[in-house]
Regions:
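N-terminal Rossmann NAD(P)H-binding glycine-rich loop of SDR-like oxidoreductase domains
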Residues: 2-31
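Conserved Rossmann-fold NAD(P)-dependent oxidoreductase catalytic core, especially the SDR/UDP-sugar
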Residues: 28-30, 81-82, 88-144, 149-154
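NAD(P)H-binding glycine-rich loop region in Rossmannoid oxidoreductase-like domains
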Residues: 37-41, 45-101, 105-108, 120-124
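Flexible, glycine-rich beta-alpha linker
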Residues: 126-129, 149-170, 185-186, 220
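Glycine/proline-rich active-site loop of Rossmann-fold NAD(P)-dependent oxidoreductases
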Residues: 158-166, 202-212, 218, 234-237
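Substrate-positioning beta->alpha
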Residues: 162-164, 181-203, 210-213
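Substrate-binding strand-loop-helix patch
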Residues: 184-193, 212-232, 241-252, 289-293
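A hydrophobic C-terminal alpha-helical subdomain
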Residues: 245-319
Length: 319
């Protein structure tokens, strides 16, 4: 019998990858989205007919959400925000209160598995509201549904991301690019396909009650990441370290934008490395190492940011 997966946050890069993976392996998927007309078609195209159902609902409409749990075997929460917005999109609501609601429903309806996507590095970043809300969410989940498995990925990248693609767009346009904290913050970028494989492994092996840190094969500083991206798109740019007071001032200005490039809270996060803490199991420990090399993967789609785009004939300097 095919198992039924209920996914929250299915329209993002991780959600779309996961829907394809699950439906190819005969799982039936129900995806909750707040805007059916805006996101429904993009989600629907990720799977064959009959394997996916899309429900339009506000995630805090508990009456509507509750009805979906009666036939749910596996609940997956991929919802997260990087900055606070309007209409109740606060860190506390999205990262703390909503996961708590899901955990209680999972317990009430005896759901077999609850998989929650958190974030790496949150234990150290105690001065960040983002990190505090993520930790609160994890605590609420463990309190209400002890069988839940929590995944903590480092930065996730792919052609559909808002990480490498945003950086390459900015590096294309700006002659000078700022380095916060001298660009020394380390990340362990994990490809979206690898993270999807890890989630599928947790489901198929029926893993419970774990916190798993999910990382790629390399620890790379932000400065190194920017240099690799510049090399891939054949650009020379000046990378300038910013004093903290200047960085904080730019964050104050940027966070006034509808889609801020940087906020004060994100600046706090950048003080801390986003790599394995070694306090919890890693994806390698559960037999799912990520082998995709950052530069090799980005090379597959970076041509869109080179001069000439897909028709670019100039090869980048691999040295």
């Amino acid at each position: 019998k095919a198992k039924n997966c209920l996914i929250f946050g299915g329209s993002g890069q991780i959600g779309r990858h996961l829907i394809r993976k699950l439906t190819k392996n005969n799982y039936k998927v129900t995806v909750v989205t707040r805007n059916l007309h805006q996101k429904g078609y993009a989600i629907k195209t990720q799977a064959n007919a009959g394997y996916i159902d899309i429900v339009e609902a506000n995630i805090f409409d508990e009456i509507k959400i509750r009805k979906l749990f009666s036939k749910t075997d596996i609940c997956i929460n991929l919802i997260g925000i990087l900055y606070e917005g309007k209409k109740g999109n606060t860190f506390k609501n999205i990262h703390s209160i909503f996961p708590s609601i899901l955990a209680k429903l999972c317990k009430e309806y005896k759901v077999q598995q609850f998989i929650h996507l958190s974030a790496l590095g949150i234990n150290n970043a105690i001065d960040s509201d983002y990190a505090k809300s993520k930790l609160e969410g994890e605590a609420n989940i463990k309190k209400n549904f002890s069988l839940a498995t929590i995944l903590r990925p480092s930065v996730v990248y792919s052609v559909d991301d808002k990480f490498t693609t945003s950086f390459m767009t900015l590096l294309n346009r700006l002659p000078v690019f700022p380095l916060y904290y001298n660009g020394n913050t380390k990340f362990a970028p994990i490809h979206c396909s690898d993270l999807t494989d890890i989630i599928y492994h947790v489901i198929s092996k029926n893993l419970h009650s774990k916190i798993i840190e999910c990382v790629g094969p390399e620890d790379i500083s932000l400065k190194e990441i920017l240099k690799k991206l510049l090399q891939l798109i054949n650009k020379n740019r000046i990378l300038i370290p910013l004093p903290f007071f200047v960085a904080n001032l730019t964050a104050k200005v940027f966070q006034l934008l509808p889609n801020p490039l940087l906020t004060e809270d994100q600046l706090k996060l950048l003080k801390y490395d986003n790599i394995l803490s070694k306090k919890y199991q890693s994806n390698s420990d559960i037999g799912m190492p990520s082998l995709r090399i950052f530069k090799e993967e980005v090379e597959k789609y970076c041509y869109m940011w080179r001069e000439g785009g897909q028709f670019s004939t100039k090869k980048y300097n691999k040295s």
